[in-house]
Amino acid sequence: MGEALNGLKRNIMCGDARESHIGQKVTVMGWVQRNRNLGGLQFIDLRDREGILQVVFNDDLGEEILEKAKSIRPEYCIAVTGEIVKRESVNPNMPTGMVELKAEELKILSESDTPPIYIKEDLDAAESIRLKYRYLDLRRPDMQNIFKIRHKTTKAIRDYLDQNGFLEMETPILTKSTPEGARDYLVPSRNYPGMFYALPQSPQLFKQLLMVSGFDRYFQIVKCFRDEDLRANRQPEFTQVDLEMSFVEQDDVMALNEGLIKHVFKEVLGVDVKTPIKRMTFKDAMEKYGSDKPDLRFGMEITNLSDVVKECGFKVFTDAVANGGSVRGLCLEGGASMGRKDIDRLGEFVKTFKAKGLAWIQLKEEGVKSPIAKFFSEEELNKIIETMGAKTGDLILIVADKNSVVLKALGELRLELSRKFDLVKDKSEFNFTWITEFDLLEYDEEEGRYFAAHHPFTMPMDEDIKYLDTDPGRVRAKAYDLVLNGEELGGGSIRIHDTKLQEKMFEVLGFTQESAWERFGFLLEAFKFGPPPHGGLAFGLDRMIMFLAGTENIKDVITFPKNQNAFCYLTEAPNIVDEEQLKELGIETIKKEDTAE
């Protein structure tokens, strides 16, 4: 059993000790990083969240305290009282490297088993072990630093929004299931057998209702939940910086959020974000970069070759254009030296995005090399090279298909080439852009109906509302995403605030009037009572912290994350619950049949 504090108070953090503290008697508390005996002296590196301080136990302390110090193992939790003195051998790699603590008293507060992972920065343990012993993983200095950054970020966000007239308000966690998009997490109701609450995918409807309520400016740092198949940087529960504003247009919301980003990056990293942030329409982003979240830290834009090749002798190209598709290409500077096997691998890569193949042209010193060169006249070939802006030493890569396939394949190929050839030269750059004028709707050919590209409450652009009846796919949205280095940092829109227009939107999405009122009647009813024009935005806080902390793994910025299958190694959730609990809720579980042959 560990020793009690008995009134002992810590008066300095280990990592805060400096030369200015020399001669002071202090008490520090923390965890033992390592313990070693050198020439009869016992040295302990003691760690807390602020850093590491060397503690020295001299041989004049007496046998009892020296033996006690020698017995200490890594991760023991201890308290040491003594005097800060100048260190004989300075360690320039440590902030506390000029001083050490000359111990006088020692308390072992608790002992530790041998840790299953090392508490160090360059940890190479398996993810499953790190997550199972997350409380140990979080002791590591780099993890501690990430969560200091997270704290500084949320404080900066709150400070800025408070200064700009926002009220921090909470919205319900137990709410109504309104399935349209990702699956809801459902919570059974004991009081209403057979009925369920849903955990919110976002506070979207409630924040709109708060605008109807007259609160004018709302924000919340809020947990959201989505029961979806997890990709690399997704979690089933995540944190959103959610805000909404009344009596605003799109430019007002974007300007406010540019100010927020500028404030956060300055406060947390000391980085000046240039504002106003550049803007790009969704159409331009797709045509130039094959993505609605383009990475603009490097060039290599997609070039449309359709007009150049529509009457050439290569049937693959002419058919693609004749069928309403396109022929487009990328130019990889210096890529002419790439071997045939590597080019073939790129061909296989684009096939994973439904492209039928990849045509290529190498511009070598000795001339043009390409398996498709024989289908073109010299004039046609030169026109392709000129249009692509290519020169000797470059490689042209071309895809021909329907537009959606061409743009997706080349967009992904552009990113693959960036990774392969390290095209992003300044890894510390923060390149922001707004993407605007998104399509309001997306058509699902399998289901034969339109879906909301963002959500059903997004306001159409004024000049496009007339097309809702005749050509819904043509309608653009008053929606905007903020993109940073090829990742969506946040997104929002101006909202519909008119009952009739909202009903029309539901109709276009295939809802009957009855089903729309059944799901969203509370919102439609509220719109009858003088709703203000309003709009907002939500930032993914976890993703923002990833950029600020310089990590590529979302699990690093969440205290207790789930794995790729939404499983918690620490608590082993989800788990089987007691039959009595299920019975009380009126739930019976059905085991899935083993379909393996």
UniProtKB/Swiss-Prot annotation:
Pfam families per the UniProt record, alphabetical: GAD (PF02938), tRNA-synt_2 (PF00152), tRNA_anti-codon (PF01336)
Gene Ontology MF terms in the entry: aspartate-tRNA ligase activity; ATP binding; catalytic activity, acting on a protein; nucleic acid binding; transferase activity
Entry's EC annotation: 6.1.1.12
Residue sites binding L-aspartate per the record: E180, R226, H454, R495
Annotated segments matching region Aspartate: 204-207
Location relative to the cell: Cytoplasm
Reaction catalysis annotation: tRNA(Asp) + L-aspartate + ATP = L-aspartyl-tRNA(Asp) + AMP + diphosphate
Enzyme class label: ligase
Cellular-component GO terms for this entry: cytoplasm
Transmembrane regions: none
Biological process terms in GO annotation: aspartyl-tRNA aminoacylation
Annotated ATP binding sites: R226, D227, E228, Q235, E488, G540, L541, D542, R543
Matching SUPFAM superfamilies: Class II aaRS and biotin synthetases, GAD domain-like, Nucleic acid-binding proteins
InterPro entries: Aa-tRNA-synt_II, aa-tRNA-synth_II, aa-tRNA-synth_II/BPL/LPL, Asp-tRNA-ligase_1, Asp-tRNA-ligase_1_N, Asp/Asn-tRNA-synth_IIb, AspRS_core, GAD-like_sf
Quaternary context: Homodimer.
NCBIfam families: aspS_bact (TIGR00459), PRK00476.1 (NF001750)
Biological role stated in the UniProt entry: Catalyzes the attachment of L-aspartate to tRNA(Asp) in a two-step reaction: L-aspartate is first activated by ATP to form Asp-AMP and then transferred to the acceptor end of tRNA(Asp).
Annotated family: Belongs to the class-II aminoacyl-tRNA synthetase family. Type 1 subfamily.
Cited HAMAP family: Asp_tRNA_synth_type1
Name of the protein in question: Aspartate--tRNA ligase
Natural source organism: Clostridium perfringens (strain 13 / Type A)
Gene: aspS
